[in-house]
A protein has these predicted regions:
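Cap/insert and terminal regions of metallo-dependent hydrolase folds
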Residues: 176-264, 349-354, 372-435
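Core dinuclear metal-dependent hydrolase active-site scaffold
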Residues: 1-52, 125-182, 309-316, 322, ...
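Active-site neighborhood of phospho(di)ester-bond hydrolases with catalytic His/Asp-centered motifs
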Residues: 29-31, 54-63, 70, 82-85, ...
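Pre-active-site segment of Zn-dependent metallo-hydrolases
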Residues: 9-14, 20-80, 84-90, 95-122, ...
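Short, flexible loop segments at boundaries between secondary-structure elements
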Residues: 265-270, 276, 350-365, 370-391, ...
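Hydrophobic, well-ordered secondary-structure elements that form the walls
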Residues: 335, 415, 440
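Metallo-beta-lactamase
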Residues: 93-151, 279-318
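Hard-cation-handling environments
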Residues: 218-358
Length: 451
């Protein structure tokens, strides 16, 4: 079989891998948008392969850096199905529509929606943790990974010349004991080949404190002591639900002061409905909370913002408050409005809770730049910028080592590191080598391997 790396090669975003069997059956694993530079944030117009010749697309999870170019793929001639877990199908309907509207020109909005709806018609939900026989040659198995609702590793078993070969695509590897979501599930078999993400391959999560303790400290300092506002940039799907759930849990424990919490992300409301629809994918505490209260994401002091007029009105709310708004990297969305209005406010704290790609405002803030350019205006940063990785859906180096550690070293013929910056990959590769793993590759974009 032939494996080609068309994305997430020596970078974090743009996951797209093409697997071709000995008989010529072609499977694309993920078809993500590339956010590494401003040019590549545009929809992909030309693929490095012929979409009409693909036989199958497998989607690890709904995040746009894994799914964002599926509508373009179908527009370019792909006629097959997109297989994924049931929650991934539901979340993709929200994320793809939102992404296409953001990327489309004003006069192309209607066409963009038609293109997304056409793509969504191809989605087929496959039961996770069960073998799914595609044909006599190919069997797939979705393994829940705890990164996002519905996120999975994809295990592919191929029968070639009377022999079985197994190849596992990690997707994004989640964390144990992450709020709201079930823990990652172990693969039913040890693969011959592993394609493994390495987002945090060079580091350990800094915080060992519980998420509630971190939030309590920041909220107390910002909203009680300084009577200011706390802005938390968060992706509408995933991080926002985790934050709201954590804040609700804190409210039930009496740990949140009586202040307004604005969730300014209309899509997050729909995302929350999807989470409550798929309760089996949540952890036991979340299931019990839903059973007791009938909701996970609605509580006293929570205000959901729907219109842009309401977004603007928040700037005239002068009491202490918490604002949760997307996007998490401050790379578009309503959070830009809140950040722009409050960068020079010394009583404001902006709490970054995850990775921000180069070229985004979030990345510049985390680098400590004294001035940020937004809407062609240089703004002095007087707000307090804080960072925690306790809400990151990605596991760290230790978690990645535990993930790889579940597999038989002797059976693993090759490990491909993807979805990480080069320095992260190098550090992870060195760690794997120290533990006795061999034949570890950091593929270049477009590089192909005969397996």
């Amino acid at each position: 079989m032939l494996l080609t790396f068309h994305g997430a090669a020596r970078q974090v975003t743009g996951s797209m891998f093409l697997l071709e069997t000995a008989t010529g059956y072609k499977i694309l694993i993920d078809c993500g948008a590339d956010f590494n530079d401003k040019q590549n944030r545009k929809p992909l117009l030309h693929f490095p392969f012929e979409p009409s010749q693909l036989d199958l697309v497998l989607l690890t999870h709904a995040h746009i850096d894994h799914s964002g170019n599926i509508p373009q793929l179908i527009r370019a001639g792909y006629e097959g199905q997109v297989l994924c877990s049931s929650p991934t199908a539901d979340l993709s309907a929200l994320l793809l529509k939102d992404n296409q509207l953001l990327r489309a020109a004003k006069n192309d909005k209607e066409f963009a929606m038609a293109m997304v709806n056409r793509a969504l018609d191809r989605f087929v939900a496959v039961k996770a943790s069960h073998d799914f026989k595609v044909n006599e040659e190919v069997t797939i198995h979705f393994v829940p990974t705890g990164h996002l609702l519905g996120a999975c590793n994809v295990l592919i078993t191929l029968k070639e010349d009377g022999e079985e070969k197994t190849i596992l695509f990690s997707g994004d590897v989640g964390r144990k004991n992450y709020p709201l979501l079930m823990d990652p599930v172990k693969s039913p078999v040890s693969p011959d080949y592993l394609i493994c993400e390495s987002t945090y391959g060079a580091r350990l999560h800094q915080e060992k404190t519980a998420p509630e303790d971190i939030l309590e400290k920041v909220i107390n300092e910002t909203c009680i002591v300084h009577r200011g506002r706390l802005i938390i940039p968060a992706f509408s799907i995933g991080r926002t639900q985790t934050l709201i759930y954590t804040l609700r849990r804190m409210q039930l424990q009496g740990r949140i002061p009586n202040i307004k919490i604005f969730t300014d992300s209309p899509m997050s409301m729909n995302g929350s409905y999807v989470y409550e629809k798929h309760l089996p994918w949540l952890d036991e505490e979340a299931k019990q909370m839903y059973k007791n209260g009938g909701t996970l994401f609605d509580f006293d002091n929570m205000v959901y913002i729907k219109t842009y007029k309401e977004t603007k009105a928040i700037s005239h709310y002068y009491e202490p408050c918490i604002i949760i708004s997307s996007s998490g990297m401050i790379a578009g969305g309503r959070v830009n409005e809140h950040v722009r209005e409050n960068l020079n406010n010394p009583f404001c704290t902006i709490l970054m809770i995850g990775y921000s790609a180069e070229g985004t405002v979030g990345n510049e803030l985390m680098q400590g730049k004294p001035y940020i350019t937004m809407k062609k205006r240089d703004i002095k940063v007087e707000a307090k910028i804080m960072y925690t990785d306790m809400f990151s859906g990605h596991t760290d180096q230790q978690g990645l080592m535990e993930f790889v550690g579940q597999f038989d070293k002797q059976k693993l013929k090759k490990i491909f590191l993807v979805h990480g910056e080069p320095e992260s990959m190098e550090a992870f590769k060195d760690k794997l080598s120290q533990e006795g793993y061999h034949d570890i590759v950091m593929p270049e974009k477009g590089e192909e391997f005969e397996l």
